[in-house]
Amino acid sequence: SLSSLILSEALILKKDFQAAKKIINISLRHNKNDPKIYYLAAKIYFLEDNLKKSKNLIDEALKLNEDNIDILFLLGNINLKKNLFAEAIEVYEKILKINNGFWPAHNNIGLANFELGKIELSKTNFINALKNTNNAESMLGLAIVLFTQNPDNEESFNIAKKAILSSPKFINSEFRKSELWGVEIQKITSQFFKKNKELNDY
């Protein structure tokens, strides 16, 4: 039922995955044709780093609704977390054909392209992500791209400062990792924060 799904979503937010799984398993026994149930189950396993199980469940969700942005975004994130960058980009681009204003897809294409060494493309992706929203993640991503292209670029510092003032948790490398920042961009971001130590005080 709808109330069960709402409760399981609340439990996922609280990171009470075991309780959420129990509700979802009961829901699946009663209704095997609701893509939302498979999606929520896939989300739990994704957060638990069980990517194989998450992928199997998201495939079931896609059979029932192949154009749902939430379902597609989770599939893209599974690919990104597995370092399947080209596959992730392909899924995110499918989302953008449905809704070009969905900034998280632009942002995550930027993350994938950075890992592929396509820095100029990554810059375009982060700029596109910022067209409709001043989200901290894409601002910091853009700052790191500019820093990569020119370590003495003052604009990169100013953009990063704005991002950190908006969301200080992006200073934390573990938090960035949870947001699917890959090895290459994490490495450069660490160099950036070492060079600009004053940003750690915000």
Model-derived features: where do they sit?
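Helix-start (N-cap) detector for alpha-helical repeat units in TPR-like alpha-solenoids
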Residues: 1-2, 34-36, 69-70, 85, ...
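Ligand/cofactor pocket segment of small-molecule handling proteins
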Residues: 66-116
